[in-house]
């Protein structure tokens, strides 16, 4: 589709005045022979194209996994040059998605990556011994939170301690992984506040659109579907029926969250805006 495909995704959403657009990043992929197989444009190019066409803040994802600290610095320098100063800082999955291994010469954890960004915000780059305010960047950093805990964490309490480390390292707000039970978000926020985390916590909502997602989403994202949602989806005979169930559930989630004065809503569209548009017309 090229850039026009991205524009075609964004254009129908403009009537809802989106406050920001997140842009995912993927590390290089290699086949068994070691040959690079990635066939997609870079995040910097996509972010710049969107920002300059729509004048809407873009939030590129910056990962530890798959990138050295030097590669990260070059990406951050490019983003700074383009005037893109909002980031979502993530550990990522690395090249092997089953077992996380940090890149040789890369940041091990999101907190380490945040410290690298904060160094650049003070004007200190990798080869510098001192800070130079004349070359300082001005990045604002969000981080990920997991209402049902990250799959690698032993417990939610342990995961929240890791989240606190990310906030202490420079995270200014939290965007949550998708969830389908609002009570888990409310409990997560309460635990975060008790742990001393005071930054905004933006809930992430993913509308279900396919029958297969009743099994796929819990497996991939280590989450649980509420019994009522799972039962309704398993009764569906077509993807259209599943999408109707998912749409109504997302509308219910969004309205309840907004009634609790959440700071914003983050929608996972996966480049398909139609379902989110239908939901937004009922919510906003």
What do these predicted ranges mean?
Residues 2-13, 69-76, 154-165, 246-256:
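Short, acidic/polar
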Residues 21, 79, 166, 170, ...:
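Conserved, mostly hydrophobic/aromatic
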Residues 69-115:
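Flexible, glycine-rich active-site loops centered on histidine and acidic residues
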């Amino acid at each position: 589709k090229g850039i026009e495909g991205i524009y075609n995704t964004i254009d129908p959403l403009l009537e809802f005045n989106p406050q920001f657009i997140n842009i995912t990043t993927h590390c290089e992929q290699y086949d068994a022979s070691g040959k690079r197989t990635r066939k997609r444009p870079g995040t910097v190019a996509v972010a710049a194209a969107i920002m300059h066409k729509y004048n809407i803040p873009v939030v590129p994802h910056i990962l530890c996994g798959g990138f050295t600290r030097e590669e990260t610095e070059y990406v951050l320098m490019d983003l700074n040059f383009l005037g893109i100063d909002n980031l979502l800082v993530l550990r990522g999955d690395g090249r092997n998605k089953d077992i996380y291994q940090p890149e040789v010469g890369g940041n091990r954890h999101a907190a380490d990556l945040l410290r690298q960004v904060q160094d650049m915000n003070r004007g200190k780059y990798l080869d510098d011994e001192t800070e130079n305010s004349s070359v300082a960047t001005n990045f604002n950093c969000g981080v990920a939170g997991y209402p049902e805990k990250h799959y690698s964490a032993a417990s939610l309490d342990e995961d929240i301690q890791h989240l606190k480390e990310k906030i202490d390292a420079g995270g200014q707000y939290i965007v949550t992984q998708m969830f389908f039970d609002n009570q888990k978000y409310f409990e997560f926020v309460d635990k975060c506040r008790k742990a001393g985390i005071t930054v905004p916590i933006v809930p992430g909502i993913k509308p279900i659109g396919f029958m297969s997602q009743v099994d796929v989403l819990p497996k991939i994202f280590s989450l649980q579907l509420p019994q009522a949602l799972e039962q309704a989806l398993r009764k569906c005979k077509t993807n259209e029926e599943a999408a109707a169930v998912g749409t109504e559930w997302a509308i219910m989630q969004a309205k309840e969250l907004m009634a609790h004065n959440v700071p914003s809503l983050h929608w996972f569209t996966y480049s398909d805006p139609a379902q989110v548009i239908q939901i937004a017309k009922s919510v906003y």
